[in-house]
Amino acid sequence: MSWQTYVDDHLMCEIEGNRLTSAAIIGQDGSVWAQSATFPQFKPEEITAIMNDFAEPGTLAPTGLYLGGTKYMVIQGEAGAVIRGKKGPGGITVKKTNQALIIGIYDEPMTPGQCNMIVERLGDYLIEQSL
């Protein structure tokens, strides 16, 4: 299965009638493995900042999480495993696997819980596959 298939079928899937607005699988080095057509163009330093927060949880909280120039307020996540952010009626979930970052971006009517479930389910599966 290609990485694009994971994005198309497992991240951009429908859940209770809702979908993520965009999603991607990004290597921990910032390389794009696969992404939805609407995923924002991000800067390498934004991925570096996310990786730094996984290494030292809490580093993004004072400044916020930036992706594609959009600032998300960092909310409760799982130290070293999941970073969650909020911006208005939407937000972002970033799940770290052994080699990649699974990123989902959502807006209403999708809920934070639905986004978390989609992103973390794929992340957990890839971790089980040692990816």
Swiss-Prot record:
Signal peptide: none annotated. It comes from the Eukaryota. InterPro entries: PFN, PFN_euk, PFN_sf, Profilin_CS. CDD domains: PROF. It comes from Capsicum annuum. Occurs in many kinds of cells as a complex with monomeric actin in a 1:1 ratio. GO terms for cellular component: cytoplasm; cytoskeleton. This is Profilin. GO terms for molecular function: actin binding. Belongs to the profilin family. Pfam families: Profilin. Keywords: Actin-binding, Allergen, Cytoplasm, Cytoskeleton. It is found in: Cytoplasm, Cytoskeleton. Binds to actin and affects the structure of the cytoskeleton. At high concentrations, profilin prevents the polymerization of actin, whereas it enhances it at low concentrations. By binding to PIP2, it inhibits the formation of IP3 and DG.
